[in-house]
Amino acid sequence: MLYWLTALSDGGDFFNLFRYITFRAGGAFLTALIFGFVFGKPLINVLRKRQGKGQPIRDDGPEAHLAKVGTPTMGGLLIVGALLFSTLMWARWDNPFVWLVLFVTMSFGLIGFADDYAKVSKQNTSGVSGKVRLLLGFVIAIVAALWASWNHPAELQNQLAMPVFKDVLLNLGYLYVPFCICVIVGAANAVNLTDGLDGLAIMPVMIAAGTLGIIAYAVGRVDFSEYLDVHYVPGTGEILIFTSALFGGGLGFLWYNAPPAAVFMGDTGSLALGGALGAIAISTKHELVLAIVGGLFVVEALSVIIQVLYFKRTGRRVFLMAPIHHHYEKKGWAEPTIVIRFWIISLILAMIGLATLKVR
């Protein structure tokens, strides 16, 4: 919205700053951060009052989690609210990729909100049926995948960019849209599975989003894309404003989610943020890089898949408990130890993901 202040500029005054994506990205970060600090405590008080017993805790989970009884959920409302407010304030409203990412974020956030509401209302961990959530997720992802494809340059449509390899695009043809659908749905559910410890999911999401934001800015500029020898996708630079807002809102939420958490993000936050990562990846055509920078989420999801399939086949378990962060809890690792080590892994993966821009 503030971008339109450039109309008041004569080319050399303060209003001219709003032309620059980097300036507006900084503004988006600070706006979302302040939003989180200002509205965080009041929101937690409202959630605690409305929810009473808070988020239901699984009886078969680690014993240490019983101490979390009474902690309110739906804290993702704070992140999504900060993200929406800040992005609308600082991003260009005529950019299709901004609206695409916001659409996916808000839509998956609504699915998560319905699930959280059902859990709190019924005081059980079931929530909305998994099949219903998956179906709705696929519907949203179909719209998003087609939306992204229509706004990509003709020479990039249905093309899958291969990281590291120079000028290598794999033409998936009619399989590209289904592939993008799986990326979005997979990312949303992988982040959802990761959100099981205080502070565990939000920092890796912020790291992945920050990395993808840098990539979006690079591929959205002709000069940067030529220098780095990556494909040019006009308009994706504005996504940096969204990811900056996500980073700021995430920090504001982490202030209250740090151990011991005063609030959980719930499915409201995890599905929204995971969907956002998937939407950014398909917008920038860096779907495979998402698997690198979001490698932690991939491992968490795979641990559940492996556990379920192996148990059905043999009646035994590979892990003490899945997702894998619970496996380490069962082994006696302290919750903060798991969280910080997973953060470190996320940072390493982000560096590897960024390196793919130059290693060609």
Swiss-Prot record:
Uppermost EC category: transferase
One GO term of the biological process aspect: regulation of cell shape
HAMAP family per the UniProt record, alphabetical: MraY
Named cofactor requirement(s): Mg(2+)
Stored InterPro entries: Glycosyl_transferase_4, PNAcMuramoyl-5peptid_Trfase, PNAcMuramoyl-5peptid_Trfase_CS
Membrane topology summary: Multi-pass membrane protein
Protein's UniProt name: Phospho-N-acetylmuramoyl-pentapeptide-transferase
Enzyme Commission designation: 2.7.8.13
Catalytic activity: UDP-N-acetyl-alpha-D-muramoyl-L-alanyl-gamma-D-glutamyl-meso-2,6-diaminopimeloyl-D-alanyl-D-alanine + di-trans,octa-cis-undecaprenyl phosphate = di-trans,octa-cis-undecaprenyl diphospho-N-acetyl-alpha-D-muramoyl-L-alanyl-D-glutamyl-meso-2,6-diaminopimeloyl-D-alanyl-D-alanine + UMP
A GO molecular function held by the record: phospho-N-acetylmuramoyl-pentapeptide-transferase activity
CDD domains: GT_MraY (cd06852)
Domain of life: Bacteria
Cell location: Cell inner membrane
Top-level taxonomy: Bacteria, Pseudomonadati, Pseudomonadota, Alphaproteobacteria, Rhodobacterales
Keywords assigned: Cell cycle, Cell division, Cell inner membrane, Cell membrane, Cell shape, Cell wall biogenesis/degradation, Magnesium, Membrane, Metal-binding, Peptidoglycan synthesis, Transferase, Transmembrane, Transmembrane helix
Transmembrane domains' residue ranges: 27-47, 69-89, 93-113, 134-154, 168-188, 199-219, 239-259, 262-282, 288-308, 337-357
Protein's job: Catalyzes the initial step of the lipid cycle reactions in the biosynthesis of the cell wall peptidoglycan: transfers peptidoglycan precursor phospho-MurNAc-pentapeptide from UDP-MurNAc-pentapeptide onto the lipid carrier undecaprenyl phosphate, yielding undecaprenyl-pyrophosphoryl-MurNAc-pentapeptide, known as lipid I.
